[in-house]
Amino acid sequence: MSGRLNLFIFSCFILTFSFSAGAQTLSLKAAVDTALANYGTVKAKGNYANASLATIQQAKRDYLPNFSLSAQQDYGTINGQNGPSYGLGGLGTASSGPALDKQNWNAAFGALYLANVNWDFFTFGRIKQRIKVAEATYQRDNKDYEQEKFQQEIRVSSAYLNLLAAQRLTRSQEKNLQRAITFKNTAVIRASNGLIAGVDSSLAKAEVSSAKIALTKARDVEQEQANRLGILMGVTATDFKVDTASISRIPSNMLNDTTIAQTHPVLLYYKNRVAVSNEQLSYYKRLYFPTFSLFGVMQGRGSGFKASYITDQHAYTSNYADGVNPVRGNYLIGIGMTWNLTTILRNRPQVRSQQYISQGLTNEYEQVNQQLQAQLALAEAKLKNAIDNYLEAPIQVKAASDAYIQKSTLYKNGLTTIVDLTQALFTLNRAETDRDIAYTNVWQALLLKSAALGDYNLFIKEF
C-alpha cells in the first residue's frame, strides 16, 4: 500500500512531536479548521478537482462543429506548367494560370475568402465516452480531495493529542522538580545541623539536577510537538495553549461499530481510480469505429487577371482594389466518412494495457480494504488496552503518592534513608507519567478506530 496510506493508518500513535509558536488558546476543532484552510496539500487537491471539473466542460464542447474563417490577399505571378507535383511537407504554391510557351513576370493582386464548417456528428459514442472519462476523472480527483481532508483531520487530531500529552508531561515534571527542591532544602538544613550525613544533601542536589534535566527534555518534546502541529495547520507558531483537562475523561461513545463504511473516504478514492480506468477502457474500444462528418464551404475569390488573359497577356491589372475584390464565389456541402482501419490493430495492445491497469487498480483497492480491516482490529485491541491502563493509572498514582508522603515524613524524622525517599520520588514521577500517557492513549485509540471506520465525526463530536 502507498506510503500516504501507511501514514494515514499509523499516524494516530506515532508521537511525532513538533516546535512551538505565540501563546494562544487553541481548541481541537479550531486546529482542524485552520489546517483544512491553510495546508498546502489540501488546497492543491482542491485545485486539481476544480481543474477536472473544468475539463468536463471542455469535453462537452468537443462535440461542437469546427467553424473556420479564412482570408488571404496575395501578389504574384500565375505562370502555369503542365506536369505532376505533390505538396510534400505542405510545401508548394497555389498559383493557377495558363501554360504559356514562355516565362513572363506579369503580376497582380489576388484574394481568397473562405468559411468552412466541419462537424463529426456521429462517432459511435466516442464524444460521449470522452465526457464520461472527464466526469469520472473529476469524481476521482474530488474523492482524492475528500480523502486528503480526512487524512489531514486525522493527522492534526493526532498531533493535537500528542501536544496535550506533552504539556501534561511537562506539568508532571514541574511538580517533580518542586518535590525534588523541597526534598533538597530539607536535606541541606538537616545536614547543616548535623542531623544527617552531608552526603544526603549532595544526593538531594543530584536529584534536583536530574529533575531539571527531565523538565528540559519534556519542554523540548512539547516544543517539537507544537511545531509539528503548526506545520500541519499551515501556521508559524512558537507556543500553543491547549486545554489539557479535555482528555482527563474517557469518551462517552466508545464506537461499538465493527464494520468499515463503504463511504470511507480512502476506499471511495481507490474505487474511483478503478472507475476512471474502466471509462478509459471503454473509450479506447470506441476508437475502432469510423467517424461520420458533415461539412460545408463558402468561398469568394478575387484576381487582378482578367478572364481573357489566356489569349491576351496584357489583360491584367496591378491595382490592389481590383485584385482583392471577390468576383467569383462557390459553395459546397457534403457528408463523409473516415475510417482508419489500421487503428483496429494499433489499439488492441492499448486496450489490453488498460485492462491490466484496471485489474491492478482493483487489486490496490482490495489491499487497502484489507489494511483498513486490520487497522480496525488493531484499534479495537488498543482501545481496550488503553481503557484498562486508564482505569489502573489513578490507583498507581494514589499508591505512589501515599508512599512518597510516608517516606518523606519518615525521612524528616530520621526514620528512613535518603535512598528509600529517592526511590519513592522516582516511583511517583513514573506513576504520573504513566497516567498522562494512559489518558492520551485512550483518545488516540478512539481516533485510530474512527479513522479505520472512515467517520471522523465519531471522534470530533467528543470535543
Region annotations inferred by a language model:
Residues 43-47, 60, 107, 121-149, ...:
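Sec/SRP-type N-terminal targeting helices
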Residues 199, 413-437:
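Short terminal targeting/anchoring segments
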Residues 35-122, 262-343, 374:
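A small-residue-enriched
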Residues 163, 201, 218, 383, ...:
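Amphipathic alpha-helical coiled-coil/helical-bundle segments that mediate oligomerization/assembly
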Residues 191-195, 411-415, 452:
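A short glycine-centered flexible hinge/capping loop motif at secondary-structure junctions
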Residues 7, 151-265, 275, 428:
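Periplasmic alpha-helical coiled-coil/stalk elements that build and connect Gram-negative outer-membrane
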Residues 1-40, 458-463:
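Bacterial Sec-dependent N-terminal signal peptides
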Residues 68, 77, 434-463:
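Acidic, low-complexity, intrinsically disordered peripheral segments
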